[in-house]
């Protein structure tokens, strides 16, 4: 399935990819980069969240609000994802699900999820969950940094140079 870039809706006539964003936990600076990229490359960026999201006016940017609930936004992203799409998420199981559909997955720090690394990431996540369940403090991720933002921007630009419509 494809979409009409003018209206950010898929159609059979216009080949293109879209960017889907797991927006509940996505840093604002990353959303801003995606908004600029949507206008520049004329690609559809769809933010999915269980809360209202304010987005800039653009035919290339839309927000989808889903009901609150465990993994409801993730399920909607998997439903919307098509082969070749880009999904922005830090959620490892969501990344695995969209990779299974033939989409690409990039985390907000600029790290790619791939068929080669997803099993290891899922195993590490499961191990950390077990440690937390046993009462062990595993800490959390480092705070989002300017370097993370630059890495993400670089990876996004490279991806769009190869995959965005011209």
Give the label of every model feature segment.
Residues 9-166:
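Nuclease catalytic cores that cleave nucleic-acid phosphodiester bonds
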């Amino acid at each position: 399935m494809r979409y009409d870039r003018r209206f950010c809706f898929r159609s059979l006539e216009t080949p293109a990819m879209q960017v889907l964003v797991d927006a509940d936990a996505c840093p604002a600076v990353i959303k801003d980069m995606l908004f600029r990229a949507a206008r520049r490359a004329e690609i559809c960026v769809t933010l999915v969240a269980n809360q209202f999201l304010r987005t800039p006016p653009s035919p290339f940017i839309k927000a989808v609000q889903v009901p609150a609930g465990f993994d409801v936004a993730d399920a909607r992203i998997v439903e919307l994802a098509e082969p070749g799409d880009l999904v922005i998420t830090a959620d490892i199981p969501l990344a695995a699900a969209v990779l299974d559909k033939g989409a690409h997955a990039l985390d907000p720090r600029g790290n790619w999820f791939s068929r080669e690394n997803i099993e290891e990431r899922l195993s590490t996540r499961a191990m950390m969950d077990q440690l937390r369940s046993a009462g062990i403090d595993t800490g959390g991720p480092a705070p989002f940094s300017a370097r993370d933002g630059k890495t993400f921007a670089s990876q996004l630009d490279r991806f769009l140079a190869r995959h965005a419509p011209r």
